[in-house]
Amino acid sequence: MVSQEPHFELRLASSPEDIRAAQRLRYEVFVAELGADGALVDHEARLEADRFDPFFDHLMLLDHRRAVGEQVVGVYRVMQEQGAKAAGQFYSEDEYDLAPLKSSGRRLLELGRSCVHADYRGGTALIHLWTGLADYIVTHEIEILFGVASLHGTDVAELAAPLSLLHHRHLAPEGLRPKARAAGYQDMNLIAEDALERTAATRALPALIKAYLRLGGAVGQGAFVDHAFNCTDICLILDTALMSEKHRALYARGRGI
């Protein structure tokens, strides 16, 4: 994958050192910045890891202008069905019943742990990652993308507006609608649709979730409150067959960046 900005390199992790570099960035974003924690988080080495990392492909954006060891500025991890079989499950299955997706007969790709270094937000970094993801999707003939996406915090009262908007306007078709598991289940129908301030609710959604919705994405039933990661998760689903022609063309080009 060749970038039009020569200081950037976009590629898949190919060594344990690469994966540790991705985990370092994830630590800075998810742990140091957002307050997450987990059983395999290494605070001394500043690495955010979990048991699923060996089964994912790790898409990394590097800026070669930075010091060695600090060049990874964006990451995305993706897992196909064979990775999930090797791991024993998809990552999202801890929080959602994925039976509707797994029985669909469609080719699935789980997305997760997307993050960009603070100095690169609002620029081209996320665009590079998304274009590289598009290349991966075309190469592997992926039909459905899914994964958990997070709203920061676990105070459901503060998240009532964006969760209600997702429930009323963006539920996935029933045949492709995962349901949050009982252990952390949170009803998203918290504010009646006619009482919802839609502009404010939309503004409260994280940029990544809004981007998926613009592509035609939808959400599963219920949110999952994740206290360990200090967030409230939703399950995003994107059926590439239902994307607009404009956005499908982006994926069909399949030429990376």
Please name every model-derived segment.
Residues 1-16:
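Conserved N-terminal entry element of GNAT/NAT acetyltransferase domains
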Residues 7, 56, 73-75, 108, ...:
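Extracellular structured ligand-interaction cores
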Residues 81-218, 223-232:
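Acyl-donor binding region in acyl/amide transferases
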Residues 55-101:
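Short, His- and charge-rich active-site/binding loops that engage polyanionic ligands
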